[in-house]
Amino acid sequence: MIVKRFPYIIICLASIIIGATITFTLLRYGANTEAFVGNVKSQVSHTVSSIASNITNRDKKEVSAEIPTTEADVEEEPFRITLGTIDDISFAPDEIGKTIRVNLETMELSTYENGTLQKTYKVLAKGKPGSYWETPGGEYQVLTKEERHLSSVGKVWMPYSLQFFGNFFIHGWPYYQSGEDFPVGSGYSGGCIRLSTEDAEELYGWTDITTRVSIYSTKQINESDVKENGYFVIDPKKKLSVGATSFLVGDIETGEIILEKNSDKELPIASVTKLMTALTSLDVVSQRKEVTILPQYLEVQGQSGDLRAGEKIGTNDLIYPLLLESSNDAGETLANFIGRGYFIKSMNDKAQAIGMTNSSFADPTGLSKDNISTSQDLFRLAKYLKENKQFLLDASKEKTHTEGSHTWYNTSQFLNTDGYEGGKRGYTDPARETNLGIFNLPVSEFHDRSLAIVVLGSEDRYRDTKNILDYLRSNIYFGDDKSDITFYVPPPAPKDTTLVFGGDVMLDRGVKTSVEKNFAGDFSQLFSPLTKLKDAD
């Protein structure tokens, strides 16, 4: 693709240089207009010729080409700019057995048997997007069946309940213990998928324990939209210095992998684990419940979050010391609230449900070297959080958060980085320095893009991430590869001067006065020897 941000920057610089030249020469030559115009012609000709030549000689290639590594990485496998994608898990019903597919965009639940569509039901309510209780997308299975289940949170009966993960069920319309129906309300539930009671009863009778449940909760990207735009490199020869063992840059919206090195290599991830801990807690821990901090929760090494034995704190409030100060005590408290073993199993189940098939977790803190993942899987996690649990990303970028006697301070190195949208960093001896961050970057001509940057096995995550950010801002472009909007400056012909303005040229007040005095306010006279400029609109 030839459309690049670089030419527009050059044009703006040209405007500034020319404006400065005009100002300087007018002040120097005063009313001596002949000397003034001659100097302008000389300066403009030299400047524009250089700009045109530089733009013309730039090599323009697509991002799909291999990019050189740093000198330090020459002996290693080079990273590549790649146009692969990590999309939402593509759905196909099981060829043998039963499958439940829920589309929370169209609000439909469909049943399949041996790969064939059986029936489609209308979904009446789902968890509110962006809230604690947003219905989680992913791949699950029916865990339990109850003809009626009493919600410990809402204190209502949920008829014909099918539990598929943590506190989430598919069920009929709820009713109070008095027998009165639950009000219709806004169409949002506490996270469960509500059907009419009649439909839920029919689904309940058809469903078996372990029946697959596939839930789609993300706005679809049309294939044509993805093909219309793409990522391109401006200068293929420009080097990117990254010392991390593995890294990846991906577009959150399209799923495109832009840059990567060893992105499928399984590595320990340290406290990046806490993003999965936070995500799992929203699904399996009752929110806004009080938990008492027990002494054994505080025995784990590392950051404490200033939690004290015996104090009571809301389960939802523990997200803040967990993500802002990387509190290991907060992670252990959340896990032990419902049973540590069950919580860790739920972390692994959640990872599998959202497509993190090469990840496994052994604790809720990241201290264990057995908490492993890949850059690709962590990109999937970032994409899932951005599309389904924005609340967690918002929490992770708060500078401070106060609750009761506690004030937690964000220790992220990237908090003041332009465009930072949230994430988590970590460190252990086996993992070295790690980071998952989402950044909103101006790599498109008209719109910023949310890009996930994952760095694993780094000796300096801040430097590696900053180098990647600088490279993206200066050398990667996202746009539409169409010839009719291609920007191209031909080489200047001998004795020919051309100039393209990307905007207005702001002149000093003294220049305006001189033009009014000497040229009766006709600014085109400044360029009288340059007919193309003088006659231009």
What are these regions (language model features)?
Residues 109, 453, 504:
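Divalent metal-coordination and catalytic microenvironments
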Residues 76-179:
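Gly/Pro-biased beta-strand-loop elements
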